[in-house]
């Protein structure tokens, strides 16, 4: 658990700084420059600026914000939307549930969409789908998880927004489970950090987030196994600047 929390501290800074500005989607001023807000706190260690417009670093145990640059500004969260999809899914399902792919999921199997080439009628476990969601960023898995858990995709999206409000998010609204572009789909660095921190309280969430590799065995529709590997440098430990304890 401690290693996962250490990893969270690093990944939060990365994920939240990678959020794309909503200004490309909605009526928000372009090229807004934000200062490092935590540098304004008297006696607080002064941090260097980051290249990203916004970013946040949060302590997973206490929720203390250690670094904040435009953390409350709305941004298009792209695929880190799937962090909330994962949280709502693990809170409302079990890993061994059988998920049958329908048109809802398979319609996302396109050349310009990250997917696992699922097929209508194909059956996988929820555990398979969640690993495809996180390691492969599979949009077909995201949509199918949503329908399976929520009954309909829209019901699941409503669950995502309700859960975000419960966690304390104030600059977040989801319109889909995968992070596909929509002018009404947005979050902030702080809100996503709150969501991630909430997820760490759940053992199944931690298990999925902590896996760098996963294999889906042959299914009723596919004879080949699907092997997933994360290429994230913090997991792969190939860079001398990362401490091993943080990326185990």
Predicted regions: what they are:
Residues 1-4, 69, 73, 224:
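Intrinsically disordered, low-complexity sequence elements enriched in Ser/Thr/Gly/Pro
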Residues 2-25:
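Sec-dependent N-terminal signal peptides of Gram-positive bacterial secreted proteins and lipoproteins
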Residues 21, 48, 77, 177, ...:
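Proline-rich low-complexity regions
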Residues 26-190, 194-203:
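Active-site-adjacent loops and short helices of periplasmic peptidoglycan-processing enzymes
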Residues 169-170, 181-186, 190-248:
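Domain-terminus/edge residues, biased toward the C-terminal soluble/receptor-binding domains
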């Amino acid at each position: 658990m401690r290693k996962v929390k250490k990893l969270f501290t690093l990944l939060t800074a990365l994920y939240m700084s990678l959020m794309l500005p909503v200004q490309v989607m909605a009526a928000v001023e372009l090229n807004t420059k934000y200062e490092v807000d935590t540098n304004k706190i008297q006696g607080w260690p002064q941090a260097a600026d980051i290249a990203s417009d916004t970013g946040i670093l949060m302590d997973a145990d206490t929720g203390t914000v250690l670094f904040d640059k435009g953390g409350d500004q709305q941004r298009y969260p792209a695929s880190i939307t799937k962090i909330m999809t994962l949280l709502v899914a693990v809170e409302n399902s079990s890993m061994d549930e059988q998920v049958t792919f329908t048109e809802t999921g398979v319609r996302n199997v396109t050349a310009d969409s990250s997917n696992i080439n699922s097929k209508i009628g194909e059956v996988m476990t929820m555990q398979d789908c969640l690993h495809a969601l996180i390691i492969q960023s599979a949009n077909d898995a995201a949509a199918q998880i949503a329908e399976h858990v929520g009954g309909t995709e829209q019901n699941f999206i409503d669950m995502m927004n309700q859960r975000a409000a419960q966690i304390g998010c104030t600059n977040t609204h989801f319109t889909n489970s995968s992070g596909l572009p929509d002018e009404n789909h947005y979050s902030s660095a702080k809100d996503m950090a709150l969501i991630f921190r909430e997820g760490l309280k759940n053992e199944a969430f931690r298990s999925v987030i902590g896996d760098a590799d996963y294999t889906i065995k042959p299914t009723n529709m596919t004879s080949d196994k699907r092997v997933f590997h994360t290429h994230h440098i913090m997991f792969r430990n190939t860079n001398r600047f990362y401490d091993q304890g943080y990326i185990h």
